[in-house]
Amino acid sequence: MGPIGKATTRALLAGVLGAALPGAALAQFEAPKGAPAGTFGTPGQPTARLSYQYAYGMESPFTYRRNKDLDNGLRDNSLLFKTKVFGSITYRPTDWLAATLEMKLGREYAIREEQQIQLPSGDIRLPPRREPTLLVEQALITVRQVIAPFEINLGRRNYEDDRHWVFDGSMDVASLSYRHENVRAEAMVARDVLWSLDALRHSNKARIESAMVYADYRGFDNQVLAAYVLKRNDLSGNEGRPLMLGLRGHGKPSAAFSWWAEAAWLRGHDENGNRFRAHGLDVGATYRFADLPFDPNITLAYANGSGDGNPGDGVNTEFRQTGLQTNEAKYIGLSKFKAYGETLDSELSNLRVMTLGLGARAAPGVSLDLVYHRYRLNAYASEIRNWALTAQMNTLAGQQSKDVGQALDLVVGFRGLFGVRRLGLDLRAGVFMPGQAFRTADGNLANTAGRRADRGASVIAKFRY
């Protein structure tokens, strides 16, 4: 993302900005051990430790949303613009100590937005205050080699996984990680926001504590298997004390085939003291026709988060994700997108999602993805947890349905725009076609079947440098 030192510009670039858990996160602050032949230096000569490195970048997304309430008769369309500039620096005074600071300056602007919106529930929603922020994304001390093969991390750290299904964001942590040959592991305790680290305004501290143990094995050819235990404790009482047990894997056993799998079991207690007994699953595979022009590919995926059809029995069987996820992924294309649909943009909770994706590379720096989703509830409900819509389902007496609807997304990724290597553009457009669960009254008492809800849509254009 930017120039780094002298002869080893590219060697640690991915480590500065890519903090995947636990892979890139564990390697995020590791100096290169040596340079491969023909890459960064003379064969057989070790690369010198870099005492510092830095990176910078920018993202500027335009976000348009239409009909979040799925009713053309109510005005709730919005067009927002957000600019983000970030920079990071890592300093290594010795081989065993590293300090990293990453900050992000951002502000969101409303180009078009209603000053007051009445939601289908009857509530009145006002637009939020939008002020500039200067956030500390990472402020981390790393100690290694002192108790090798263990590593100690203390401070604010960014965690991500490939599909953003478990983690995508920063937490204030104390962690101990282990790395030896094909095994990597990490144990940590954390608070979502322990310190208010916004230089321009006060940010509320998040009263959610986490404890996690994560381990993966990489002894297979281009494949990873992992397991984790994550305990969350919301001290404010809003989210309860969930305990998640997870198994996951992903890989690319050949140039043509790639796959992923997520399986999680939810235990612990919810905010009402009910026991969690829920499960979630997300599996998929992509096949690439490498011998054909434009590298066409096809993806099939299935996701299922259990629901709770009997909420009064003292057992909550509705699956919830970690609360740290954003569910963004990509298949073979250049751009990430919302894995469960751009317009719905929901958590995997009380929901089944069937997905078919078709992709191609129109040019070396241009990718296309067309993604279709089919949604269905596991238990009757009026809404889906943490979705982007404001509409309500199953409001007609005697007309309940589990048919949520369908969605179609188009994702176009550009890299190296106008010959500028670092300049990119992501275009993501989605339309949601509501199903029978969204039928609403049309004002005609004789029409007990009601009317179909209107379509919703979203468009995001994100420039990146």
Question: Where on the chain are the PLM-derived regions?
Answer:
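Acidic/polar loop patches that form or flank catalytic/metal-binding clefts of enzymes
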Residues: 224-226, 258-260, 290-301, 308-312
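Transmembrane beta-strand segments of outer-membrane beta-barrel domains in Gram-negative
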Residues: 218-280, 284
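A surface-exposed, glycine/aromatic-enriched loop/edge motif typical of exported proteins
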Residues: 299-325, 383
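Cleavable N-terminal export/targeting peptides
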Residues: 1-35
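Outer-membrane beta-barrel proteins
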Residues: 74-77, 161-170, 203, 266-278, ...
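Beta-barrel outer-membrane channel/assembly domains of diderm bacteria
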Residues: 27-152, 174, 178, 247-259, ...
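Active-site beta-loop-alpha junctions enriched in small/polar residues
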Residues: 59-61, 104-106, 190-192, 230-234, ...
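Surface-exposed coil loops of outer-membrane beta-barrel proteins
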Residues: 112-138, 144-247, 314-357
